[in-house]
Swiss-Prot record:
It is a peripheral membrane protein. Pfam families: OSCP (PF00213). This is ATP synthase subunit delta. Belongs to the ATPase delta chain family.
């Protein structure tokens, strides 16, 4: 399983690098990155779309047609439309989420930006995201972009990851620590 994951990561990195270099050469980094963020949002919201790109049962032509139609309807840049067509034709659609992530990470590194991955028990409000962004900008000395997700299993609080650093202030972790402390008392 881990070797498959490493293979997906390698495929995603190679395709993302090619897309990045093409977009940079054509002066379209901003448009391509905006399109990829939109595609990421679509993938996050649509289980059906995730299944279409991940399914080995769906043929290359059908995946290509689906991705091309989606890209055209969304008004994506020609580079992104062609890229998605090539990815589907090469039967690499399963790696699209990784390709998007690798592309955006490379762009962020070029711009001196850092991504903070925040997992919270409930969705963050705009005010909370703004306050977190300000605090993280100050703490890291970099421009921070927030990648927020929700995990109700946290019960409350949040887990913040910036690079290799992590702060876990979730209620579930605090309860686990309390449970361990109580075991030592008896």
């Amino acid at each position: 399983m881990s070797s498959h994951k490493a293979g997906v990561t390698g495929v995603a990195e190679r395709y993302a690098t090619a897309l990045y270099e093409l977009a940079e050469d054509r002066g379209a980094l901003d448009q391509v990155s905006a399109d990829l963020r939109s595609l990421k949002a679509m993938l996050d919201e649509s289980g059906d779309l995730r299944r279409v790109i991940a399914s080995p049962v769906i043929g290359r032509d059908d995946q290509r047609k689906a991705l091309t139609a989606l890209a055209e309807k969304a008004g994506f840049h020609e580079i992104v439309r062609n890229f998605l067509g090539v990815v589907a034709a090469k039967h690499r659609s399963f790696a699209v989420p990784g390709m998007i992530g690798a592309f955006l990470e490379r762009l962020a590194a070029r711009r001196g930006e850092v991504t903070a991955r925040i997992v919270s028990a409930t969705a963050l409000t705009s005010a909370q995201k703004s306050a977190l962004t300000t605090a993280l900008n100050k703490a890291t000395g970099n421009t921070v972009t927030i990648d927020a997700s929700v995990d109700p299993a946290l019960l409350g609080g949040m887990v913040v990851r910036v690079g290799s650093r992590m702060v876990d202030s979730s209620l579930s972790t605090k309860l686990k620590r309390l449970q361990l402390a109580m075991k030592g008392v008896g």
